[in-house]
Amino acid sequence: MSKTTSLALIAALSAGGGAALTATMYSFRSQKQPTAPTTTTSLTSSSSVPVPSTQVFTNPNAPLPPALAAPSPPLPGSVPGSPVNPAGLFEYGFPGPVADLASRHALISSYDRRTRNPHWVVEHITPASLAQRGGDRKHSAFVEDTSIPEKFQAKLKDYYRSGYDRGHQVPAADCKWSQKAMDDTFYLSNMCPQVGDGFNRDYWAHFEDFCRRLTTRYPSVRIVTGPLYLPKRDPVDGKWYTKYEVIGNPPNVAVPTHFYKVIFAEDGKVGGNVAIGAFVMPNAPIPNEKPLSDFEMPLEAVERAAGIEFATKLAPQRRKRLCTETSCAIVVKEYADRQKSFGKGGSQSRSPSP
């Protein structure tokens, strides 16, 4: 995908997407060969991860894939024959960047120390996991993630009177199968500042419900969710600028301009088809009348915007487009009704976020 094409897509994303652009661009397929990433990770893992009794897909107790479980890659050394040795700095410590990976009962997350938000959070839902009711939101509380070095943590006080919800990336309603799973969704490393009315408590919540309803058709649905910080063209000078608020005192947590979800709906067969849907929404009020298809984007556009590749090992012949396989449409539910159905408990300093 060219930079010109990417800028055009980013412009569409900044404006809230568009069905015509989506239809035009979705047929694009990148021919670029994947390259092996070089990252530094810090890993937090749950000691025991129960599996819903009728779950037959991926066992969360299985070892993490090598890409997640491997230690830091070998540090670069000096070039033979060079009169200088920049690698000598690493004797004092390697600067990173570091992605704090957490493997918990309900999710796996990668945390961005610079923005104090996750890069991405992955979840897996099935008809069996959603049918169980072992967890209740009223027994959960928002908590700071102490597995992250203190100076890089998002803090509860950062959100206090900020005007933003503590927006779940993996929603609590997806993790009712145990209280521990429910509790795992309340770490601040699973949160981003989200606009409440019109977004987190409305359109975004309807979108999360759409993801859950996919399990009526697909036996296994995997979802990766995360924030974006997209540039916007200045109408005066025509240049692109990335601008976002930072909440907290002192400023600590970045407020994303947009959020993405990439959905992998599996047919349940070994080597079977996977219906992929990639969506980007602005962190702003969205009318409930807005078609969900307006926010569908090519996977490659989301990857370029996020700096992340989601499906390098998924063969093209196994990929299907989610919104041609099933109807991509939200069902509007009032916020008060969702509170009752989700089992939400007492109030805090602000309305709890979905």
Model-derived segments and their meaning:
Residues 2-354:
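Domain-level detector for secreted/extracellular nuclease and nuclease-toxin modules, and
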